[in-house]
């Protein structure tokens, strides 16, 4: 308030007027120049990720069709009719003292109650799977937000859902690193770098173990039907374990929905990542000449199991990938190849002796 006012400044020249941008003249390329011309393209990884997210959102979003509404209305009317008829039968049995009919009504009521409870439980678990996609979108918004007050509550909710105890060392380090002056982006980023890797490491170990078991089973077993059943069972078990690690309890329909989303993701992304991560390395090492056909099939099955686990991890994870921390097939490739080679060498050693 006590500082003196600055004196006025007079400019001699006129103000600069914004001029319209000048475009260069049209240039026509001949055939030789056109062959060397390469148009700029979008990042294929970002474009593919956006398309996959759109497919997953469409699959998670319930379809509000007319037939669906008619079926739901018919089921609701049928359920109300069954309840009303059951109440009427119970009253008639009580008035006429027909204890056999009354016992049948009680048994029917227990069966209907168990069925309704199962439907409600399945719906709640399926709703929880859908909420995980919304939580991932919320985390993505918080990672670009400069506000305060929402990041800490959001991260504490994620830790509670995952079953991380308040005395866990990673959570204690996160609490010690945050303070009131940090915005939501910084708080969520600290959680992603300090607490989330604990769950990610456990999921990676599950994926690595399942991929190794699939690889060795295919490489050793001579029965294709047994191999297919084993791989299907191991993949479903892997999805259940990954979902449990990230705090998602799967029911029957939610398990089918998650498995469908994983297969959709893999089919939509195609085999480009598999070829990019594995193809050149296999050609360079000439594994086809070193390993048997069954061993090569085992490595392929193990890599597909690893890819399935990575996609399940991506769908169940509450946070988007940050700083290129997404696991890659190359992380599991060398381990699978080393285990197959070690198994084959152990099998050849006794025969040589």
Swiss-Prot record:
GO terms for cellular component: plasma membrane. The chain crosses the membrane at residues 70-90, 100-120, 213-233. The keyword Cell membrane applies. It is found in: Cell inner membrane. InterPro entries: DUF697 (IPR021147), UPF0283 (IPR006507). Keywords: Cell inner membrane, Cell membrane, Membrane, Transmembrane, Transmembrane helix. It is a multi-pass membrane protein. Residues 91-99, 234-353 are cytoplasmic. Residues 1-69, 121-212 are periplasmic. The keyword Aminoacyl-tRNA synthetase does not apply. Belongs to the UPF0283 family. HAMAP family: UPF0283. PANTHER family: UPF0283 MEMBRANE PROTEIN YCJF. This is UPF0283 membrane protein YcjF. It comes from Escherichia coli (strain K12). The lineage of its organism: Bacteria, Pseudomonadati, Pseudomonadota, Gammaproteobacteria, Enterobacterales.
